[in-house]
Design a protein with these regions (language model features):
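N-terminal structured subdomain of primase-like DNA metabolism proteins
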Residues: 1-109
Length: 109
């Protein structure tokens, strides 16, 4: 199993990652203001995407601020999810106290 999938398995398909890093309280499937920019309307929510089998954030006001828990973690921590993906994974494992060894493994973005 790859590291990304193992994180998803241990975090309720990414929902716990959103709960940990989200600087505001939210309820899945309920709209809130996006904390990543000065959002004027509550048009953002966290939902379970059946196609990818994980939780995702969707911002209907600004599509550029939508993505999965790995994208969101990168945005919060100031990482580039494409070039620093392993940093994102190791940050999640460390910050959430997941019992996942981080040796040389497949990350599978």
């Amino acid at each position: 199993m790859n590291l990304k999938e193992e994180i998803l398995q241990k975090t309720n398909r990414g929902l716990e990652v959103f709960y940990f890093y989200m600087p505001i309280e939210f309820v899945p499937k309920r709209n809130f203001r996006n904390p990543l920019y000065d959002d004027k309307r509550a048009s953002c929510n966290i939902y379970f995407d059946t196609q990818s089998q994980c939780y995702r954030m969707k911002d209907f006001g600004n599509e550029a601020y939508s993505g999965d828990c790995f994208w969101f973690t990168a945005a919060i921590l100031g990482f580039d999810v494409r070039t620093e993906f392993i940093k994102v994974l190791t940050s999640i494992i460390h910050d959430l106290g997941l019992n996942i060894p981080i040796k040389e493994r497949k990350t599978s973005e």
